[in-house]
Amino acid sequence: MANRYDPNPFAEEEEVNPFANARGVPPASNSRLSPLPPEPVGFDYGRTVDIPLDRAGTQDLKKKEKELQAKEAELKRREQDLKRKEDAAARAGIVIEVKNWPPFFPLIHHDIANEIPVHLQRLQYVTFATYLGLVLCLFWNIIAVTTAWIKGEGVTIWLLALIYFIAGVPGGYVLWYRPLYRAFRTDSALSFGWFFLFYMLHIAFCVFAAVAPPVVFKGKSLAGILPAIDVLSGQAIVGIFYFIGFAFFCLESVVSIWVIQQVYMYFRGSGKQDQMRREAARGALRAAV
């Protein structure tokens, strides 16, 4: 039976180092070895490195830089000149018009919503519709006359139809649409006078084209009712094209008559008639002097 004073059987036995010095060596301390100081890597960041540059390339860059600076100065000068001219024109009451219509290929300046008084915008839009209607009528007239030419009516009527289109489209804009636009925008009585004169000629032409009497080449250079009846019996397709042109010219005539009535009512009601007479008298006096 084990003695109650026997040592603990579970205690760790003392380790004996067989290589220990028999004479007794002081035990090693738990202190660790101090780390070695870091050695510098062989990169000298403070040293500058001379990279050989291409002097010719540097001179080209400097030359281009000077050219760019000169161009920039020239653009600034032009911008200042343009701003000065715009300011001078604004002080003088001159309106600088920027082409904005049609949107895909601007040819004219057209901004009814911002330049025409609100109570006149509807009438201006309808007048613009009559101008576009004239363009449509003359274009369809070319198509109808082309079919007649193909069917053997001769090339002369086609050339006349082309002349109507080339003269009528810009003529309508310059002679009566633009004067009314200017009259509504600037309240000019003389512009109203120009509009009335040439718009009445426009209405007369549309009525004449709708009838197309046999005055010039039996009237077949215009797609009216008389040539439509004439060619319908022998050439049905040509007759149909002429009847469509007749309908277009009739519609253009009716709407144009309504427009000139409305413009004249506004002209009389606003007292522009007396103003136009005074402006005409002053213009005649200046011309005489």
Curated annotation (Swiss-Prot):
Cellular component per GO, a single term: transport vesicle membrane
Any GO BP annotation: protein transport
Keyword set includes Iron-sulfur: no
Any coiled-coil regions, as ranges: 55-93
Annotated region described as Disordered, given as residue ranges: 1-45
Compartment(s): Cell membrane; Cytoplasmic vesicle, Secretory vesicle membrane
Role description: Probably involved in membrane trafficking.
Pfam families, sorted: SCAMP
Keyword Zinc among record annotations: no
Membrane protein topology class: Multi-pass membrane protein
Natural source organism: Arabidopsis thaliana
Protein name per the record: Secretory carrier-associated membrane protein 3
Signal peptide annotation: none
Modified residues (Phosphoserine): 34
